[in-house]
Amino acid sequence: MLRTTVVLLTLAAIAFAAPTSDDIYNNVVIGDIDGAVAKSKELQKQGKGDIITEAVNRLIRDSQRNTMEYAYQLWSLEARDIVKERFPIQFRMMLGEHSIKLINKRDNLAMKLGVATDNSGDRIAYGAADDKTSDRVAWKFVPLSEDKRVYFKILNVQRGQYLKLGVETDSDGEHMAYASSGADTFRHQWYLQPAKADGNLVFFIVNREYNHALKLGRSVDSMGDRQVWGHNGNVIGNPELFGWSVVAF
């Protein structure tokens, strides 16, 4: 009888053991975001938030696609304190729709919009050679959730226009990035996948319609600016080439 009692108590202890960072990590990887959120809330309540931080750091280091879904769900379900305390500040800036700058890792250029407009009123997106401070490089991320996925519309604050990829392609099958006043297509929607480059957090910014990640072209115009394109190919594993830093404006 005593032995049975000990076994039952041991099983009960296991059943009610606090979640581990592996538990949260695995939930996020397989897409069980609800499970990850529930475990995170429990840990935060118990004063064991460092376990959450450990899981978040691993998700970022491994460039896991569902990391933003996890953060968004916490943000949306009255657990913003977890995002503020356990995630890098960039997540809070994007989910909170703060003004930010997007700095390309490879060339250290901030994204801006050109002054000229085409026949549709669209503006070309560039990496600015000499501007990291004006309103032209200020952007906001506007989150939206659909089918358990999180996408963003990316708004240029000065122009009130949303970043998109054009329809036409070049000889490499790549689409040029523009901004337009409307934002009613999947070409205007983006998902973000975190990564580490030289120890710093960057994001792959991937278009929903074409699954192309943003990059800067290799050609330089007379002002030293580079056009923004969607890359036709895999970018995972190359954050130093295709990553973007999110910096407070």
Curated annotation (Swiss-Prot):
Signal peptide (residue range): 1-17
Domain of life: Eukaryota
SUPFAM superfamilies per the UniProt record, alphabetical: Ricin B-like lectins
Transmembrane segments: none
Protein name: Microvitellogenin
Task of the protein: Small vitellogenic protein found in females. It is synthesized in the fat body, secreted into the hemolymph, and taken up by developing oocytes.
Cellular-component GO terms for this entry: extracellular region
Matches recorded under InterPro entries: Lipoprotein_11, Lipoprotein_11_N, Ricin_B-like_lectins
Keywords: Signal
Organism of derivation: Manduca sexta (Tobacco hawkmoth)
